[in-house]
Amino acid sequence: MQINREAILADWEAHPMRKPRIAKVTINIGVGESGERLTKAETMLEQLVGQKPIRRRAKQTNRDFGIRRGEPIAVKVTLRGEKAYQMLDRLLEAVDRKLKASNFDEHGNFCFGIQEHINIPGVEYDPEIGIFGMDVCVTLERPGFRVAKRKRQRRKIPTKHKLTKEEGIVFAMEELKAKVEGL
């Protein structure tokens, strides 16, 4: 994949409304079972982020895993604004600021996994809680995306204003100081 980094940066410099920003950071811990482990994951996530997570329920029954439909099996938390930038900085340190090009989707959003939460700077191991892995998803947007989300006079985002995979990669490299492998 060839990225014209200078052209993208020049476009953002000339048109500030085209420069992407982080819309939200979603942290998900899929425990796979309800009960004590789910409660521990919820406690750990609340301590890590400082915000109460919500429980996610199973969409369908899976007898092989012993999961019933509607049973809580995961916890997630969504961060927005300055809190999202600060938390993402800590989460990227846990993976040594390395991302793969395959982590990015066609709209510039990216996700990465953290194997053990104790790799995050400032987190101590607690034997009562244990160790959990997590998925981190970062959603990017441009100024003006509210047009598609508002209640009145909702409009579609024009194709030329939508983010591309290349712009998402350049944003991660420039703003978040991440190294993207596999280009």
From Swiss-Prot:
InterPro entries: Ribosomal_uL5, Ribosomal_uL5_arc, Ribosomal_uL5_C, Ribosomal_uL5_dom_sf, Ribosomal_uL5_N. The keyword Ribosomal protein applies. Belongs to the universal ribosomal protein uL5 family. Keywords: Ribonucleoprotein, Ribosomal protein, RNA-binding, rRNA-binding, tRNA-binding. GO terms for molecular function: RNA binding; rRNA binding; structural constituent of ribosome; tRNA binding. The keyword Signal does not apply. PANTHER family: 60S RIBOSOMAL PROTEIN L11-RELATED. This is one of the proteins that bind and probably mediate the attachment of the 5S RNA into the large ribosomal subunit, where it forms part of the central protuberance. In the 70S ribosome it contacts protein S13 of the 30S subunit (bridge B1b), connecting the 2 subunits; this bridge is implicated in subunit movement. May contact the P site tRNA; the 5S rRNA and some of its associated proteins might help stabilize positioning of ribosome-bound tRNAs. Part of the 50S ribosomal subunit; contacts the 5S rRNA and probably tRNA. Forms a bridge to the 30S subunit in the 70S ribosome. Gene3D superfamilies: 3.30.1440.10. This is Large ribosomal subunit protein uL5. One of its GO terms (cellular component) is cytosolic large ribosomal subunit. It comes from Thermococcus kodakarensis (strain ATCC BAA-918 / JCM 12380 / KOD1) (Pyrococcus kodakaraensis (strain KOD1)). It holds the Pfam family Ribosomal_L5. GO terms for biological process: translation. It comes from the Archaea.
